[in-house]
Amino acid sequence: MKIHHLFQPHFRLIYLFIWGLIISGLSDLTWLIPLNVLAVSLFFISLQFSQKSFLPYLKRWFALVIFIVLMWATLSWKIGENGIELNFQGIELAEKLSLRTHLLLISLWLFLWNINDAVLVPSHWQIAFARKINSTFCADRTLHCTAWRIASKNGYCHARSWISSSA
């Protein structure tokens, strides 16, 4: 197997999934901060070499920053015995979550570098468990549609009986 085969889109999705699991298990700031610095550095180096525009990435990153600010706004305080107090556990959790989400976003950009939607959509079918997930999704969707039809028919029948009984 040649080395470039290991960087095919479906393998990148698998690597990204495993990396996401690793990131979600990290809780030590001495690991999260250097990994964020490394990921951002690699991202900017990749941008420099490919000569892509930073603007689309900046818009997505700004949406993440808004989410992180809202997360900090909700986790950094609590209502205690003396009214509103600082929540030090919440601040610590907000630090970890913001570093994790930032690392996940930058990692997503790096792992899916130069992959557009036309390549990404067919690549998930090459993963072994994708068929099972898609079958489950289709079965769930069918069940939803059937339940909706039954509920709408029952509602229609109930409405007809209500109309006929009131007339």
Curated annotation (Swiss-Prot):
Coiled coil: none annotated. The keyword Membrane applies. This is Uncharacterized protein HI_1620. It comes from the Bacteria. The lineage of its organism: Bacteria, Pseudomonadati, Pseudomonadota, Gammaproteobacteria, Pasteurellales. It is a multi-pass membrane protein. Keywords: Cell membrane, Membrane, Transmembrane, Transmembrane helix. It is found in: Cell membrane. The chain crosses the membrane at residues 13-33, 37-57, 61-81, 103-123. Its main location: membrane. One of its GO terms (cellular component) is plasma membrane.
